[in-house]
Design a protein with these regions (language model features):
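Surface-exposed helix-capping loop/turn segments at secondary-structure junctions
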Residues: 30-37, 105-116, 152-156
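Short, contiguous alpha-helical
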Residues: 2, 14-21, 25, 33-79, ...
């Protein structure tokens, strides 16, 4: 569906992913480098979580969808099933910004019909829409993990509930 100015309307799934990313950043607000390096087993370090979500977005939206891998280091330090690592929060946030910036350009250009198209291999057989949903829900899983780690570390002023969803990413059918 196009907007009045002729530009494509961003699919609701993409809006929800963008809102979820903003909530994830809110969960990270106030986390310092030293705390992000700590690993309270069996949980991951916060630095790893940041890299891991960048890794997943890169894998789905850049490597598979566009055949580019701008931050190959993520495959080494934050891939699913890899050994536990404790990468620098600063480095992983920089990688996350690079990956999500590139992914956003692609996601923002997707017409709604593209969400039903298959995401190219390698990886699970899934549509682009399935991949966006999986990434979105994966963020929420790790938001909970980050907040649990922060609680164990005694961090005050943690987010306690979902932010302003109805204003920033309200429901719409198309």
């Amino acid at each position: 569906m196009d907007q009045a100015d002729g530009t494509a309307m961003i699919p609701p799934l993409v809006e929800q992913l963008r809102f979820t990313r903003s909530e994830w950043l809110r969960a990270l607000r106030g986390v310092g480098e030293a705390d992000a390096l700590r690993r309270i087993e069996p949980m991951n370090s916060i630095g790893w979580i940041v890299g891991h979500l960048a890794w997943q977005e890169q894998r789905y939206f850049l490597t598979r969808a566009q055949r580019v891998t701008p931050v190959p280091l993520l495959d080494e330090v934050a891939a699913n099933g890899g050994p536990p690592t404790t990468p620098s929060l600063r480095d992983m946030r920089a990688a996350w910004r690079e990956v999500t910036g590139a992914a956003d350009s692609w996601l923002g250009s997707l017409p709604a019909r593209a969400l039903s198209e298959m995401l190219p291999p390698p990886g699970a057989t899934q549509t682009v829409g399935d991949a966006i949903q999986r990434v979105t829900y994966h963020y929420w899983f790790h938001i909970g993990e980050i907040l649990a780690i922060r609680q164990l570390l005694g961090h005050p002023h943690r987010p306690e509930f979902v932010g302003d969803l109805e204003t920033r990413a309200p429901y719409r059918a198309t």
